[in-house]
Regions:
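N-terminal membrane topogenic signal
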Residues: 1-18
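Aromatic-anchored segments of alpha-helical transmembrane domains
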Residues: 21-28, 69-80, 140-151
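Short, hydrophobic transmembrane alpha-helix segments
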Residues: 28-37
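Interfacial segments of alpha-helical transmembrane regions
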Residues: 53-70, 128-141
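Membrane-interface transmembrane-helix boundary segments in multi-pass integral membrane proteins
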Residues: 151-189
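Membrane-interface capping segments at transmembrane-helix boundaries
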Residues: 192-206
Length: 206
């Protein structure tokens, strides 16, 4: 099987350049407002790896980020929509979109959360779903959770210190990280993996 990343760099002849153009705008804009630490967030790593997957034409990278992003971005959209139409957040995590201390143009760039699931479904449909993406994404998330602990409790990147709903923090730290990863895998990653495996299975040998 192997874990080769590259597959067909010509798979997305136009979209790969669109992805590069997006990164040229998005990375400096985000870095100037939120700093480089923000790129440790799972959702922002997903942007970087999706664009890499489009550039390389890699089913493995695109599949892993489809597993990571489709349901998570749907939750983001529901929370933002709830705030917009009902005046309150259902889950939290999109409060910054209404924070006038951040430039409006940069906040609007976060609307990529609405586009990313569609982009990933389209991309995976084009190249096929690689089921190894599920395991790769669990490995990526696990590594990011560990790294996120070094950012400090106040930042709480990727909820590595406390959960976003009840603010609970499990001790010792490995228990909290393991519980967080298990939650991500069971609630977000596994259902998406099963759905994509059924819908966009790649032919044997590819």
């Amino acid at each position: 099987m192997g874990w080769s990343i590259a597959a067909d760099s010509s798979a997305f002849p136009r979209m790969r350049w669109a992805a590069a153009a997006w990164l040229a705008v998005w990375i400096p804009a985000y870095a100037s407002v939120w700093g480089p630490r923000n790129f440790l967030l799972l959702c922002d790593i997903a942007v970087l790896l999706t664009c890499a997957g489009l550039w390389l034409g890699s089913p493995l990278l695109l599949s892993s980020q489809a597993v990571s992003s489709i349901l998570a971005d749907a939750v983001w959209a529901v929370d933002a929509g709830s705030r917009l139409f009902l005046g309150k957040h259902l889950f939290g995590g999109t409060e910054y979109m209404w924070d006038a201390s951040f430039p409006l143009a940069v906040r609007l760039l976060s609307l990529f959360h609405l586009v990313w699931p569609v982009l990933l479904v389209w991309a995976v449909r084009r190249v096929g779903y690689d089921p190894r993406g599920f395991g790769l994404q669990i490995a990526i998330a696990g590594a990011l959770l560990v790294v996120s602990r070094f950012a400090g409790r106040a930042a709480n990147l990727n909820f590595a210190f406390r959960d976003p709903i009840w603010g609970l923090s499990l001790e010792p730290a490995p228990l909290h990280l393991a519980a967080t990863l298990a939650f991500l895998a069971a609630v977000f990653y596994l259902p998406t993996h099963l759905l994509l495996s059924r819908a966009f299975r790649r032919p044997q040998g590819l």
